[in-house]
């Protein structure tokens, strides 16, 4: 049911929110790991639905802009109103929740895995599986997860019926082949995927589900990780799983085109490229070492009362490495400048570089600091770099 008529039985304000209760509702409240329905109530947006004090509360946006005008709350207790749910949102929840049921049932059947936690997030769903019923299994491998994924989709492809049954007493419900023991004694709802005699899954649940397993569409597992003695399964179901598959396939196609590779040899091409990258990094490392050593020797051989040189290509870390090579051989001061960032790196075995920066950089809007043998000053303009170095050189004469 997507639409209905209901009577307002209560309107209250709490924490700045307007909460409405009805004599009957088609809105599913948040619960059991599933998010609530959203939709319309008397023309107003329903943004949250929850159960409390044996009633269902609908949070509505009662101040909204309609046709360019701001309309205030016109809802009154006793009003007969139209209510409707956002069916796309409901069906999305149904697909995901039922997909989780089927997959949990397969984990239990194959490996004795008990679902101890379920979260339906915006980007993915998770279940926490505890291996309890079959002692021969002590971990969930990726191959095991792939088998569960396949078996889950096989159930979906069979388009088995999803049967919901209600029981007043625990004793009546316990006659079914339940995956998990019941947690309550009365007013029990059981959801079975497949025949009651031999279901793919059968468990107590208050959530929403499609009429058949085929409506789930598909299930895809993305990741398995250990978590607090259990195994957390990241997965998606329904249209979301399909759309995520499309997105990932698009990325895969882009990579194939960039690497001029087909799917079957994509990994080989990628690994070959990684080897080239590794080789290039190794060559660059040795080239930089040679350049740094050569620069350090040049500075040592041309040391005057002050030495200054600007670098456009070398990084700040490279320039710092040059400074390390100079340690113990600078009886004056060396200014090595990283031009792209207007950063002056000072090195000296005689003068206190940190003190020089602290006392003089701010004169030209610079900032920085450092130790006695090395320091840095950063400026906003190149002209301040030159003026700063001239000032220090004159100060040290």
Sequence positions of predicted segments:
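Conserved nucleotide-binding/hydrolysis modules and their immediate coupling elements
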Residues: 1-79
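Short amphipathic
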Residues: 3, 7-10, 166, 303-313
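Short, hydrophobic/aliphatic alpha-helical segments
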Residues: 9-26, 78-91, 184-200, 349-366, ...
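A generic structural motif
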Residues: 18-20, 53-68, 125-130, 343-345, ...
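Active/ligand-binding-proximal structured segments within catalytic/core domains
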Residues: 25-41, 75-128, 373
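Glycine-rich, acidic loop segments that terminate in or are immediately followed by a histidine
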Residues: 33, 195, 200-215, 306-397
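Functional cores that coordinate and move charged inorganic groups
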Residues: 89, 109-227
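Conserved bacterial/organellar gene-expression machines centered on ribosome-associated P-loop NTPases
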Residues: 136, 229-353, 374-379
